Amino acid sequence: MNGRFQVLPDAIQVNLEHGETPADIVPVLSDAARLARERQLQNLLVVSGLGDPATAEAVSTALQEMQALGAPPARIAFVAYMFPQYSVYHFAESYAQKFGIEAKVHVSIRDAKDWLGVRQETPQTLPRG
């Protein structure tokens, strides 16, 4: 799975695309949470792209792993353009509450950034890993 990270002023953005199995998203989202913790950022912006194989089970596992890291992000904005992914990330909104994470699914990156309060500056792109 391709998971490209961008460091935004107030969040880590991860683009999920070209996955083979739902489990592919788990290490990508865990790495994003780890990077956010290292950078002392409280927000994740997860953008569902072409070939995002997310399922409710995989997202649940990813949220559990983020919690196990000891410092889950305070807020996660999911951006989904296709109904199957929108449905999965809509489920994640309520499931994330179990871990004290506020989550919301959006249909545009701009709306997601507004919800997170991310300032609009040039992001820094980082390779995953």
Region spans (language model):
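Amphipathic, Lys/Arg-enriched alpha-helical "gate/interface" segment within cytosolic domains
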Residues: 1-129
